[in-house]
């Protein structure tokens, strides 16, 4: 399966038969290289990706300033150190799951709930980890 198919079929999917979908999603390498993305995934800056990687390595570094994706500021919520970062921005948010080689990212807005986004992103991330990726 191609990386784009993972984004299209597993991240941008109908969530639990509700007819709701993530706003955008992507799979990236740890260096910030985009492997696959939805058509509307925001164009992030290299320094934003560096901040995300640092947060995975040293949890709490983004808490004082927030996490930025394409200039949009997300308040960093409790995640799982070294494995998951969750952020909130208004009625929406972001979930990022780190695997051995990739970052699986999902951005959502209402009516998608935070837990639904987390489930979709983390399920794919866990699958990739199980596959040695």
Swiss-Prot record:
Gene3D superfamilies: Dynein light chain 2a, cytoplasmic. GO terms for cellular component: cell cortex; cytoskeleton. InterPro entries: PFN (IPR048278), PFN_euk (IPR005455), PFN_sf (IPR036140), Profilin_CS (IPR027310). Keywords: Actin-binding, Allergen, Cytoplasm, Cytoskeleton. This is Profilin-3. Pfam families: Profilin. Belongs to the profilin family. It is found in: Cytoplasm, Cytoskeleton. It comes from Ambrosia artemisiifolia (Common ragweed). Binds to actin and affects the structure of the cytoskeleton. At high concentrations, profilin prevents the polymerization of actin, whereas it enhances it at low concentrations. By binding to PIP2, it inhibits the formation of IP3 and DG. Occurs in many kinds of cells as a complex with monomeric actin in a 1:1 ratio. It comes from the Eukaryota. One of its GO terms (molecular function) is actin monomer binding. PROSITE patterns: PROFILIN (PS00414).
